[in-house]
Amino acid sequence: GGGKKKTGLVIGAVAVVAAIAVGAYFVLSGSGSSSVADDGPHKLITPATVLGGQYKKGDNSGDDGMSKSDLKDAEGWGVKNPKDVNANYQSGDKSNPLSMKQLTFGGVYGTIDDPGKAVDNMFAYMKSKQEKEGTKDGELLGSPKAYNPSGLDGAVLKCQSLKVEMGSSAGSTGPKDMTMPVCIWGDHSTLGLVMPVDFASAMTGKASTPEDAADIAAKLRKDVRVKA
């Protein structure tokens, strides 16, 4: 029915935005500073479940990795010996789309001298890409804001809202646009981008609050970041 179609559109919008966001990993230069302690080499993994088993990895997770040339270029942008991971996680029942929540996660790991700079410049890259290509795939609102949820140890974490136009295809009852938070953490080994979407909230035009998204990002980091 109409509800299912609208949910499909929201999922489609999230997928598009996630694809853009993942491209942001690799311009990591510019200004910024951080005083994050270095707790030794870590890598990123994509376990079958995260957040206490609440979210399960989607069937199509991890298909679209970065190309060798992207990873090679990344060394010049501040990540030494970079490797990448990405996955989509879902909770809820597919037969009841409005009960579902989705987490889009992408990251790189290697050696990062300045985590704050890396986070700032991922956001700056997304903004410059949007300025070049227009807002058809989403418009970043305001500026990235730092969050420090409980459980965030030794990392910089910032979130920024992204507005996605749903267009006429959303129908008369669906939202004309949807705002979703994009959160990025940085430490001396890993950079992670997290986009949580609650589909029931998304139908009202707001996928999640930045505070909730920051909290989820901090929890997810604990699940996907392990000693190298």
Segments from the language model and where they lie:
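Hydrophobic single-pass membrane-targeting/anchoring helices
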Residues: 1-48, 52-54
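Alpha-helix capping and helix-coil boundary motifs
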Residues: 6, 114-118, 208-209
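Small-side-chain structural scaffolding
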Residues: 13, 21, 106-107, 192, ...
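Short, low-complexity, polar/charged sequence segments that are solvent-exposed and flexible
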Residues: 30, 122-127, 202-203
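A small/polar (G/S/T-enriched), proline-flanked helix-loop surface module common
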Residues: 50-52, 56-181
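Extracellularly exposed regions in secreted/surface proteins, prominently low-complexity, repeat-rich
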Residues: 144, 149-228
